[in-house]
C-alpha cells in the first residue's frame, strides 16, 4: 500500500476523552522509587504557559519524503531531544512534524506525571486538560511486543483513547516520555527515543505530583516553548 493511500486514512475527529490509560490498570512493574534515585539537579525557569486553545493545524495529506530525524523540545527546564524511529512510524512522525511546524505545541504545559505503576510525563495537549488534540486522528504504528518493560526508559510514544473505529486509531498530539522502565499493553505507537534531556524528565518526576499523589499535575511546571524539527 502506498504512503499516499495510507495518509488518506487520517480521520477528522475531535478527541473529547482523556487520553492514555489509568495507572490503576497496571501492576507496578518494579519497586524502584523515583525519589530515591540519584538524579542530577536541574534549573527550571519560571513559565507563564497556561492551558489554551491551540492554533488550528491541518493534517498532512501524505507522508513526508524525508522523515524527520530529530525533534528538539525547548522547555523552561532545558532542551529535550528526541531521535525518531524514522520509517518505522512515518505517519506519526509526519503528523507530529506538521503540528510542530504549525506552532501547535508552542507554550504548552506537560500536564500529567505518573510515578507509580508506570513512569511517564505526558505532554502535547495545549489545553492542559488531558482531553485536547487536533481536529484529526491517525492509526497506530510501530507497536512493541507484549512483555516486561516493553516501554523502556527514554521511550517516546503516543497517548491515545483506544484503537478507534475499525482500527483507524485515535492518535493526535499527545505523547508521553518514559523516565523509568515501564510495562504497558502494546497499544501505544513508539515514535522516538530521548537522546538528550532524560535527566530533565527524571528531575521533574523526582519533584513529584501536586498534592502528593502518584498521578496528576507535576509539582515542577514544565512547558514546551517551541519545537524544532530537523532532518539531520
Residue ranges with predicted function:
Residues 2-4, 8-9, 20-232:
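Cyclophilin-like peptidyl-prolyl cis-trans isomerases
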Amino acid at each position: 500500500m502506498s504512503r499516499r493511500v495510507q495518509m488518506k486514512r487520517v480521520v477528522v475527529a475531535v478527541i473529547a476523552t482523556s487520553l492514555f490509560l489509568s495507572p490503576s490498570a497496571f501492576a507496578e512493574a518494579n519497586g524502584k522509587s523515583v525519589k530515591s534515585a540519584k538524579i542530577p539537579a536541574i534549573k527550571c525557569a519560571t513559565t507563564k504557559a497556561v492551558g489554551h486553545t491551540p492554533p488550528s493545524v491541518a493534517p498532512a495529506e501524505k507522508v513526508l519524503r524525508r522523515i524527520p530525524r530529530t525533534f528538539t523540545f525547548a522547555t523552561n527546564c532545558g532542551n529535550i531531544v528526541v531521535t525518531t524511529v524514522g520509517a518505522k512510524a512515518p505517519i506519526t512522525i509526519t503528523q507530529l512534524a506538521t503540528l510542530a511546524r504549525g506552532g501547535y505545541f508552542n507554550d504548552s504545559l506537560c500536564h500529567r506525571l505518573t510515578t507509580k505503576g508506570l513512569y511517564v510525563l505526558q505532554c502535547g495537549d495545549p489545553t492542559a486538560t488531558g482531553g485536547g488534540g487536533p481536529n484529526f486522528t491517525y492509526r497506530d504504528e510501530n507497536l512493541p511486543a507484549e512483555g516486561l518493560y516493553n516501554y523502556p526508559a527514554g521511550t517516546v510514544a503516543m497517548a491515545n483513547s483506544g484503537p478507534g473505529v475499525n482500527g483507524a486509531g485515535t492518535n493526535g498530539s499527545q505523547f508521553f516520555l518514559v523516565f523509568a522502565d515501564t510495562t504497558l499493553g502494546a497499544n501505544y505507537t513508539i515514535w522516538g527515543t530521548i537522546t538528550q534531556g532524560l535527566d530533565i524528565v527524571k528531575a521533574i518526576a523526582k519533584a513529584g505530583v501536586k498534592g502528593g499523589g502518584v498521578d496528576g499535575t507535576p509539582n515542577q511546571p514544565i512547558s514546551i516553548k517551541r519545537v524544532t524539527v530537523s532532518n539531520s
